Swiss-Prot record:
<dbReference type="GO" id="GO:0005737">
    <property type="term" value="C:cytoplasm"/>
</dbReference>
<comment type="similarity">
    <text>Belongs to the MurCDEF family.</text>
</comment>
<dbReference type="GO" id="GO:0009252">
    <property type="term" value="P:peptidoglycan biosynthetic process"/>
</dbReference>
<keyword id="KW-0547">Nucleotide-binding</keyword>
<dbReference type="GO" id="GO:0071555">
    <property type="term" value="P:cell wall organization"/>
</dbReference>
<dbReference type="GO" id="GO:0008360">
    <property type="term" value="P:regulation of cell shape"/>
</dbReference>
<dbReference type="Pfam" id="PF21799">
    <property type="entry name" value="MurD-like_N"/>
</dbReference>
<dbReference type="InterPro" id="IPR036615">
    <property type="entry name" value="Mur_ligase_C_dom_sf"/>
</dbReference>
<keyword id="KW-0436">Ligase</keyword>
<comment type="pathway">
    <text>Cell wall biogenesis; peptidoglycan biosynthesis.</text>
</comment>
<dbReference type="InterPro" id="IPR005762">
    <property type="entry name" value="MurD"/>
</dbReference>
<dbReference type="Pfam" id="PF02875">
    <property type="entry name" value="Mur_ligase_C"/>
</dbReference>
<dbReference type="InterPro" id="IPR013221">
    <property type="entry name" value="Mur_ligase_cen"/>
</dbReference>
<keyword id="KW-0963">Cytoplasm</keyword>
<keyword id="KW-0961">Cell wall biogenesis/degradation</keyword>
<dbReference type="GO" id="GO:0004326">
    <property type="term" value="F:tetrahydrofolylpolyglutamate synthase activity"/>
</dbReference>
<feature type="binding site">
    <location>
        <begin position="128"/>
        <end position="134"/>
    </location>
    <ligand>
        <name>ATP</name>
    </ligand>
</feature>
């Protein structure tokens, strides 16, 4: 691991990933300079304490950071958009300096470990607009239950490089890495080669950062590399469009790249995963060839046998969208060679991630769900469809809309919502978009008022869902704070009503 030895490296941005890259580069013997447009970025004290030899530069990101210096590599923090660092990256490219990010450093580290220690772990990667954290955490649990050592890292932490440093120090390099990757981390990365990768879905998000939907989709597609198994949501046309055209081989059928699909419908190919309704019960299923000993004629579709894995009701995570998340996790863990039986027990035990359609309690036969992490339209569409397949939903929407198109909410609100309560800065935009649904649209000035209005609209057996489809910063510190205020409001409402409160205390 001496590619960085005695090299001068420049790190752009001093957040969690920037600090992790600085630690890694210093560990590898590099001379480190960190630049940030802020005079006191959040990790500056940690950098100065842990790496006193590192230089910190505050100011604009301009070409002078690399031109006329002895910098030999530039590493960009994922929070910085291409526009933020364009001047530096273009200057670096012009003079032949490599520029990458934490994922590129992590990939190089694994290549070095393979060369020096014959370390060849399976690497499973997860991306998509929504569901990444749930599928990443669940895949890690399934791999562990499948009997393999595993490290889970990436987008929301811990960072890839800090996790690698910890395992190297402890002598516990895992057999499998499960990593969550955002479009920010994947932007511009071309050397990443996972064993298998999943794209869960694609809906509008971060367009202000990427500049266009096409650029956002292209960044997500980098997750597959050139050779890894592709795990694809077959119900999402933009995801399926990532599958390359078949390669024509002389005297053979055109060869499709290795892939597995999943979705809420029936699987169509051997090895694919899906959902099947049997006598009113929804099952997780996998398609197998009915008779693998029979060779199919050219162009003939193999006869399928659907292997029922477990009822969706046996999952602790709620909603059809979470059943689909479970299928994606099964496909990923299976790609790492994990046995199916132990993984199914793991699925039953998984309780979900905080603020992602998380049940927080029931009173007066109405169940309350916290999906405060639903900060974009796609997340809320999935939450409504997931919960609405079983009951009517009163949904709390609103906040900072980030310039999104709210039109995709019209269909699920029309189908699944009994009422909508609007909060926050972009409530008027949501009202305009949802007017055609003819569902009651109420407005609240505070979360407490929103909860009270939602509860008043609910019937026994309904769900009240906080899934704002918007960022939180107009009214709250962050989405966790929004969730905390929601839970507190629900608890206070139950107490004031003198109702029995079944579930988590706020």
């Amino acid at each position: 691991m001496n590619a960085l030895q005695d090299q001068h490296v420049l790190i752009l941005g001093l957040g969690a990933s920037g600090l992790a890259m600085a630690r890694w580069c210093a560990r590898c013997g590099a001379r480190v300079t960190v630049a940030d447009t802020r005079s006191a970025p959040p990790q500056l004290a940690a950098l100065q304490r842990e790496l006193p030899a590192a230089q910190f530069i505050s100011g604009a990101f301009d070409a002078a950071l690399v031109v006329g210096t002895d910098v030999r590599a530039v590493f960009k923090s994922p929070g910085l958009s291409p526009l933020d660092v364009a001047t530096v990256i273009e200057a670096a490219n012009t003079i032949g300096i490599r520029a990458t990010g934490e994922l590129g450093l992590f990939s190089q580290a694994l290549a070095d470990l393979k060369a020096t220690q014959n370390y060849t772990p399976k690497v499973l990667a997860v991306t998509g607009t929504n569901g990444k954290t749930t599928v990443t955490a669940l895949t890690g649990l399934l791999v562990e239950r499948g009997g393999k050592s595993v490290a889970v890292a990436g987008n929301i932490g811990p960072t890839l490089l800090d996790t690698l440093i910890q395992h190297l120090a402890a002598g516990t390099l895992p057999e499998v890495w499960v990593i969550e990757l955002s479009s920010f981390q994947l932007e511009g990365e071309t050397g990443f080669e996972p064993s298998a990768a999943a794209v869960l879905n694609i809906t509008q998000d971060h367009l202000d950062w990427h500049g266009s939907m096409a650029a956002y989709v292209a960044a997500k597609a980098h997750v597959f590399g050139a050779t890894g198994l592709m795990i694809l949501n077959r119900e999402d046309p933009q995801v399926m469009a990532m599958l390359p055209e078949p390669v024509r081989v002389k005297l053979q059928r055109p060869q499709l790249r290795a892939h597995v699909t999943f979705g809420a419908d029936l699987p169509r190919r051997p090895g694919d995963f899906g959902l099947e309704q049997v006598n009113g019960m929804l099952w997780l299923v996998r398609a197998l060839e009915a008779d693998e000993t029979l060779k199919n004629r050219k162009g003939e579709t193999p006869e399928l046998f659907l292997q029922r894995l477990m009822p969706a009701d046996a999952l602790r995570i709620r909603g059809r969208h979470n059943a689909v998340n479970a299928l994606a996790a099964l496909a990923l863990a299976q790609a790492a060679g994990c046995a199916l039986g132990p993984m199914l027990y793991g699925l039953r035990d998984y309780r979900g991630e905080p603020h992602r359609v998380a049940p927080i309690g029931i009173f007066n036969e109405v169940e309350f769900f916290d999906d405060s992490k639903g900060t974009n339209v796609g997340a809320t569409v999935a939450a409504l469809a997931g919960l609405g397949s079983e009951r009517k939903v009163i949904v709390i929407l609103g906040g900072e809309g980030k310039g999104q198109d709210f039109a995709p909410l019209v269909d699920p609100v029309s189908r699944y919502a009994r009422a909508v309560v609007l909060i926050g800065r972009d409530a008027p935009l949501l009202r305009a978009a949802l007017q055609a649904t003819h569902v009651p649209l109420l407005e609240a000035e505070s979360m407490a008022q929103a909860v009270a209005l939602a509860n008043a609209q609910a019937h026994a057996g309904d769900a009240v869902l906080l899934s704002p489809a918007c960022a939180s910063f107009d009214m709250f510190d962050n989405y966790e704070h929004r969730a905390q205020v929601f839970a507190q409001a629900v608890g206070e409402l139950a107490s004031a009503a003198g109702a029995a409160w079944e579930g988590a205390a706020p």
